[in-house]
Amino acid sequence: MNSTRSEKLEAFGRLPDILDGLRVKCPWDRKQTNESLRTNTIEETYELCEALMRDDEVNIKKELGDLLLHIVFYAKIGDEKGEFDIKDVCDSLCDKLIF
């Protein structure tokens, strides 16, 4: 929990690289679309809410990871369509947070 900023950025940076590989090598990941992921995203959101209500730190961490995967997955699909990528998502969020 005392990770440095560099360690945090490195950990986050691994995720898009792993997903890139999965989109090539894994048939399930390769066939996913925004629509096919949508119900899974809703399910993962409910699982996070349940973990939060139970104050279950182990499952909060797990479910946050699952949702983070979905965010990166949607951004990857957007990138493949030439619409946006994870940088655009992060920039949009940061621009919204800065007032």
PLM regions: where:
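Flexible "arm" and connector segments at domain edges
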Residues: 1-64, 69-99
